[in-house]
Amino acid sequence: MIEIRFHGRGGQGAVTAANILAEAAFLEGKYVQAFPFFGVERRGAPVTAFTRIDEKPIRIKTQIYEPDIVVVLDPSLLETVDVTAGLKEEGIVIINTEKSKDEILEKLKKKPKKLALVDATTIALETLGLPITNTAILGAVAKATGLVNIESVEKAIKDTFSGELGEKNAKAAREAFEKTEIFEV
């Protein structure tokens, strides 16, 4: 089973990203589970969401404490949240940032096996006109992990958002897929 933990802020779409990733994996015939963790969050407060993907039915119902993959939608969270808490030894960290690999590694408490960086904010602003990075970051997830193919991500996005909004969000994911930089750490 692959366990993914998303870190974002309220209103950024971390929960939607977790759900779309699950939908993309489901489209490929996998078993999935996606759910948010809500405390007293409000818009702008840190939010966590989770996705599990497996080849067999998923029976566990807990939060993800030891993720295989961590996805960070808002790089400012690196200053206040230990996003790598519990990350498995072979873990992958995917971050929306314009910063360099070295700048990001300085901020991580635990070094991942693989680090993927993409400026999803700029992609979202150029494609959608809004700094909502949830669909763009899924392109980076597809590229860095190989868990799902980009076509399944695009279809899941279009199933979630209809019409022009779906097309633009799918375009953002594809662009992020193409622009994601991956580093073995």
Curated annotation (Swiss-Prot):
Gene Ontology MF annotations: 3-methyl-2-oxobutanoate dehydrogenase (ferredoxin) activity; pyruvate synthase activity
Catalytic activity: 2 oxidized [2Fe-2S]-[ferredoxin] + pyruvate + CoA = 2 reduced [2Fe-2S]-[ferredoxin] + acetyl-CoA + CO2 + H(+); 3-methyl-2-oxobutanoate + 2 oxidized [2Fe-2S]-[ferredoxin] + CoA = 2-methylpropanoyl-CoA + 2 reduced [2Fe-2S]-[ferredoxin] + CO2 + H(+)
Organism: Pyrococcus horikoshii (strain ATCC 700860 / DSM 12428 / JCM 9974 / NBRC 100139 / OT-3)
Enzyme class: oxidoreductase
Record key words, sorted: Oxidoreductase
Span of the signal peptide: none
Assembly mode: Heterotetramer of one alpha, one beta, one delta and one gamma chain.
Record has Oxidoreductase as a keyword: yes
E.C. designation(s): 1.2.7.1, 1.2.7.7
Record's protein name: Pyruvate/ketoisovalerate oxidoreductases common subunit gamma
